[in-house]
Amino acid sequence: MTTIAKILAREILDSRGNPTLEAEVTLDDGSFGRAAVPSGASTGTKEAVELRDGDKTRYLGKGVRHAVDNVNGTIAETLKNFDAADQQGLDRRLIDLDGTENKGRLGANALLGVSLAAAHAVAASRKQPLWQYLSTITEADVALPVPMMNIINGGAHADNNVDFQEFMVLPVGCSSFSEALRAGTEIFHSLKSVLKGHGLSTAVGDEGGFAPDFRSNVEALDTILEAIGKAGYTAGEDILLGLDVASSEFYDNGKYNLVGENKRLTSEQFVDFLADWVAQYPIISIEDGLAEDDWAGWKLLTDRVGKKVQLVGDDLFVTNPKIFKQGIDSGTANAILIKVNQIGTLTETLEAIAMAHAANYASIVSHRSGETEDTTIADIAVATTATQIKTGSLCRSDRVAKYNQLLRIEQALGSGARYAGRDAFVSIKR
């Protein structure tokens, strides 16, 4: 039976040394599931609420004891004897129990931990890997996603002068996920050598990418191109580039403040700036190119380059189906970033991905800068045919854990394993 017998939560640490919540669900048949909740650094203002204690005498106010207590008390009592195989019903019960629009009473971290742990428990009960169980819910074809590998960190993810948060390589020309992972790894090590040769730091940021103090944002792009060539790959053919601009972080009073370029730009000027980069570099994906409240700027960017570049809404959509619908209806962006903790339940996450597929928007399953060894997002990416995954660079075990899980899934699928490759960008013509 998949009836819930016990729910237990605890406070653990994430990859930045901050507390986060881990939940466990045990079923009547003894099957067991566990999930840990990630946490972001650059967050959208409309994200579901991550409940923190605020007690400055403990973990600098970042403890999650209240969220843990909510799981071990109200949530555990309410869901005891509930059928965990009814994922949609379970998540609806959690949402109703919280009773707020932003999950601020019990905490999205409390709800998400239980939601994901329940799915793990049911998969264990059915003796299925999580990706296989989830595919019975989504009814989607399974596919290995293109990894968007964040090899240079800036912005809120690093202590340097680079404004843009992530510079990524996408190995689209490879025949399998394992070959794509190898290509990314070789480029990562090549980049380390290039940085050393230029006398730059090879310290890494929150997501495992290097965080050198470049003089400008464009220097980061040029250095990556050098590393790609040195590793024996061809930029624009084997490897494409992606950016997470995270522009809400440097948007102030209607202007975009680029410290690296010493420029203060209007929305129109910043769209021109990004369009120039697209013309000069093999950039296939731009995330959060405009600020989350600059919908007019987003529309300008979409009209300007949206037919040839993937434009990803992260802070813009915050994995929220209601907000995402506004983007679809207005033709804003052409892809959505999927972060499970932005919305707070597995069901709502899957709903956002299904909406993207129906509207011919690409969906990219993503980690957060504060991660754990939990690998759930790898299984979600495969089970939903999301075609792309963002889970950081090629070092730090909290990032590599997801890549290793994808390798296991690829091996389990055997000859049926399909790598998205160049077909990953469903919203644009290639």
From Swiss-Prot:
It is an enzyme of class 4 (lyase). Disulfide bonds: none annotated. CDD domains: enolase (cd03313). The active site is at E207 (proton donor), K339 (proton acceptor). InterPro entries: Enolase, Enolase-like_C_sf, Enolase-like_N, Enolase_C, Enolase_CS, Enolase_N. It is found in: Cytoplasm; Secreted; Cell surface. Its cofactor is Mg(2+). GO terms for molecular function: magnesium ion binding; phosphopyruvate hydratase activity. Keywords: Cytoplasm, Glycolysis, Lyase, Magnesium, Metal-binding, Secreted. Component of the RNA degradosome, a multiprotein complex involved in RNA processing and mRNA degradation. Catalyzes the reversible conversion of 2-phosphoglycerate (2-PG) into phosphoenolpyruvate (PEP). It is essential for the degradation of carbohydrates via glycolysis. This is Enolase.
